[in-house]
Amino acid sequence: MTLRSRNRGPDPTIAIIGVGFAGIGAAVKLRRAGYRRITLFDRATGPGGTWWHNTYVGAEVDTPSVLYSFSWMPWNWSRTHVRQAELQQYLSAVVDAYDLRKDCRFGVDIQSVIWDEDACEYSIISGGEEIMRARYVVSGVGLLSDPNIPNLPGLSSFEGTMFHSAQWNHDVDLTGKRVAIVGSGSTATQLVPALKGVAKQVTMFSREPNWIVPKRARDYTPRERLALESPVAQRIVRLKTLFQRDRAQFGAALWRPGSRQNRAAEAGARQYLESSLEGHPDLIEAVTPRHPYGGKRPVISDTYFQALLSDNVKLVSRAVAEVTENGVIDAAGDHHEVDVLIMSTGFKAEFLSTLEVIGSEGKSLHDYWDGDDRAFLGLMVPEFPNFFIMYGPNTNGGTIVSNLELQASFVSSTIRHAERCRAKFVEVRGWAADIYDVVVQRMLAGTAFQYEHNYYRSDSGRIATQWPDGVISYGVLTKVLRSPFLRYATGTRRSPVVTATQPAPREGDH
């Protein structure tokens, strides 16, 4: 029996915004649940999301490849930590394996989704016009999707080449050029080693250093690749790695300054720093962070410290104050002549920064949040019915792809239950969202995430991005916090509520 015949009604239309890990994961879960009227939108011209756009030299993941992939589609990875091209190839293969390409509309920038109270569906807007109506909308836009380019004085006067690392200009030949990298995060620390053998001079401007730990990345041996061709073997490796990471983050202990786990992590990072730069006390001082371990996202790299010892690499431990026609002036007033200026300044850390969402009674989601992003399980917001946020508030942490799989299961089960109830919409109850947020914030209290200079905090100082524990605890909550925390209604928001007297169906129950 198909889901459609069981519902005894039309297959609901579902719009998914974004064709990266989040959007693809949600689409596959919904497709496997029996839904066919799924449309995926992406402003890019192909699948991959972040890994379609971020094609900078040296781009690779920080997470082990066996975890940075879907559990239901293992892959014969070439490395322990895969590079951008192979990861983008993987996501493209997933799209084709599940026949999603025909449902993808690439090169379409969705500006807004607007809830129609009477029809109980969303109007999908692109280019100022409605291009589709959908009963449900799943956002796979993510948190870090809109590049942040600082408005530096004199930037427009620069006569060289300038671009953001997430918008890499492959037409520019960096051979023999004087290259400046602004930033000191994960991308910047990948760029320095990658460019030092090409550019004449690489100058990195680091306003504040990060704790750095070794990645231990390497190519898999032929024997390892042969073993990992077995889905069972890869699942065992995946689960072992997942449990090890989960145990380290249990109860947020790793992120609590003064805890045994946090002290050990910081001591390990400090030892790695000092041993890598032994004999260079000035450099050691320049790259030693002043914040507790976890106060900013730790950087994972095997090659950065060694690159700093190269003759053509210069670290400037000051921010860029001004840009001139032929270079930059740092905060101390020193001028540095450069030919190419690469902004490795991250992204606008704002949920749904590229998407406007209008919910019940014409409310804007960004106005509703008012700079204080929050969501039930990171997925649903009161008064925004039939709308789901993948990788939403307080879901960053643990293992991202595993979290996304859990979220996709929640979305699929919630939609299935709504259709079985013949509900026109489902939304989280306000009291449930409030209680959930209070509990999460209490769990986050006292962690290094409260450090002032990071992207974890909202305008009010509340920690808006991080999940305080591991994947397992989050997974349990996505299975348990269903009914009665959700409200199913048969018509408009004023219609009688369908009482969910049974839990939402388990995955595979169709």
Q: Where are these predicted regions, by residue range?
A:
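Rossmann-like dinucleotide-binding core of oxidoreductases
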Residues: R4-D11, F21, G25-G46, S139-Q271, ...
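Beta1-alpha1 glycine-rich phosphate/pyrophosphate-binding loop at the start
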Residues: R6-C104, R207, S275-G279
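Short hydrophobic core segments
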Residues: I17, M132-L144, A180-V182, V328, ...
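Short beta-strand to alpha-helix junction loop
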Residues: W75-A93, P257-R263, P292-T303
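Feature captures the FAD/FMN-dependent oxidoreductase FAD-binding
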Residues: R79-L144
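Helical element adjacent to the flavin cofactor pocket in flavoenzyme catalytic cores
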Residues: L87-C104, R297-E322
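A conserved short coil-to-beta-strand element within the FAD-binding core of flavoproteins
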Residues: F106-C120, V316-A331
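C-terminal, flexible cofactor-proximal segment of oxidoreductases
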Residues: W211-P214, L226, R374-A375, N386-H510
